[in-house]
């Protein structure tokens, strides 16, 4: 069972910046081929390390605020946040 969370701009602060454990954020889009290729690996990581790291996917087409804030210019882009 996957533990990957579908995030968005409105929950980014709580789910990512205020998380007690490290968070891997996948900035992606549904039309992106490489994003689709990396998705199964992220699913596996989310299961294997479910209590050690949180994985959140942010669709950049629908959620542009934090993609712009962190300078996301190509996708997929993976960023790790630890304690904000």
Label each region the model flagged.
Residues 4-23, 64:
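A short beta-strand-turn-helix
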Residues 20-22, 37-58:
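Conserved helix-turn-beta segment immediately C-terminal to the redox Cys motif
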């Amino acid at each position: 069972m996957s533990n990957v969370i579908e995030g968005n701009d409105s929950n980014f602060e709580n789910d990512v910046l205020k998380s007690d454990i490290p968070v891997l954020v996948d900035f992606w889009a549904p039309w992106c081929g490489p994003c689709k290729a990396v998705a199964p690996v992220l699913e596996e990581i989310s299961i294997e390390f479910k209590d050690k790291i949180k994985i959140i996917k942010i669709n950049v087409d629908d959620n542009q605020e934090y993609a712009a804030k962190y300078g996301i210019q190509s996708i997929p882009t993976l960023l790790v946040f630890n304690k904000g």
